[in-house]
Amino acid sequence: MKDFLIRGMTGDGFVKITAVQTTAMVERMRQIHKTLPLATAALGRTLTAVSMMGNELKYEKGSVTLQIRGDGPLGAVTAVSDSEGNVRGYLQNPAAVLPLREDGHLNVGAGIGREGILTVIKDIGEREPFTGRIELQSGEIAEDVAAYYVLSEQIPTVCALGVLVDRDQSVKCAGGYLLQLMPGAPAGLVDLLEYRVADVGSVTARLEKGMDMRQVAEELLYGMDLQLMEEHPVAYECKCSRKKVESALVSMGREEMERMIEEEEQISVTCQFCDAVYTFGRKDLEELLRSTKK
């Protein structure tokens, strides 16, 4: 089944839901970065979250960056989404290993760390991107994303994220959802949603049973006249190109480019998001340098 994102609202307009299925997306990330299970789960959750956050943008060429810097062995985790929910990402230590938790699950919270900062950067086409920061709440990512919405954007939010890694270290299933209360929602609605969230349980448990995220959303909001407003495919999609790398080299300035031409026979630039390698020989660099004089 292909990955997809849906967005909907209850009939009374009090609850918004965004849900995304990301199994193929997270597996593609694992193949690119050769992540071990702990890193697969951590970056997979982050990609799932930022996909939903990016889809909120009204600016077609906008992007959302979600960065988590904790004190755990995984190091910094960075994920970026466009306005359609297509993502890319990387983390500092894809080979980090920790013992499983007592319940047998991967210890993502310890991998990220309990102390640190979650940063959200929204590029919405204005002069300066919007940046919001909060302290990490648990390092489990879903709780931290929910806290970001509450503390930084004042939107009561429930976030659920899940990545199930198979015995061969491939991604068996992945997905998540954001449930958000709109202004004017009655107080009793919170209790109902908390009950529904607890009753549905983990995202991966539902996906492993053969459900998809559309069905999970319908179960969460059963009897509340869920109206889907949007549904489309999403994917792991890097935006890098040789032309963009050339622009980055030129932006380093004439002095630095002249130094590279003098000291290096060739240089290689590796994309952090997809591991694509772009190689430039002296003639390539000299041509780039000449182009800056025009």
Regions of interest found by a model, annotated:
Residues 198-294:
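Cys/His-clustered metal-coordination modules, chiefly Zn-binding fingers
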Residues 1-230:
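Interaction interfaces in information-processing and related assembly proteins
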